Amino acid sequence: MNDGSPLRKMLAGLDGQVSYALSLIDGPMELAPYIGQSFTLRATGVLSCVSCGRRVKKLFAQGFCYPCLTSAPEAAECIVRPELCRAHLGEGRDPEWERAHHDTEHVVYLSYTGAVKVGVTRSTQVPVRWIDQGAVAALIIARVPYRQLAGLIEVDLKRVLADRTNWRAMLKLVPSDHDALLAARDQARLALREDLQQHFLLDEVPMDIAYPVLAYPPKVTSVSLEKEPVVSGRLMGIKGQYLLFEDGRVFNVRNHSGHHVMIDPPGTAA
């Protein structure tokens, strides 16, 4: 039996418009040929940890087995709460990994997905992080030498700015809004506590991001491989980490990390 390939977060690049590829065992599979065509993704029932590769019966937090959830640096609490990061102190689940990924330059940014939110990412993850969120525009507002400091700025700004994306609103046709980003930057500058002001930037300009979407559905329904092991339909586009189908169903690839799948050739009906 073909066990298929484990899903991972989609690869994304930006050259005028976002280009997407699935990260599969045999290498990246470009998704542009599938847009406007029938697309079928079949779960094989196999699950494997995104960190250690071990086959398991259950996955946690976007693809980890339980032992890796509690020990892998990629699953540490500071991934979602950067203010708790200890990398700059030489500490963490894996100090070498922490040095490479967290004790390095980070940015604090504002992204626009229909509303403004504040976030943190490693400098080398710009603009990929914004693409993963489905942002149509984003603006860097601070640049710092390590993750924990970026987290402190984010926590302080969460008093006046949202820090989460409304995925349903994001999956609509959202026009870029530079005015909203610049107004939020002014609000952030006034709100940020004095000892963090030295890191604030006023000379950055917003970046626009366009997605490969033929048409946006008026209403979206999220589907999962646990409930629907064969996901098939006309692929109308991709935004964030979501595949958008003609009938309004949407599939979050990243949330299915570690799920093994097989994919039919372009235009093949289920």
Q: How would you describe each model-predicted region?
A:
Residues 1-270:
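Non-catalytic accessory segments flanking enzymatic or RNA/DNA-binding domains
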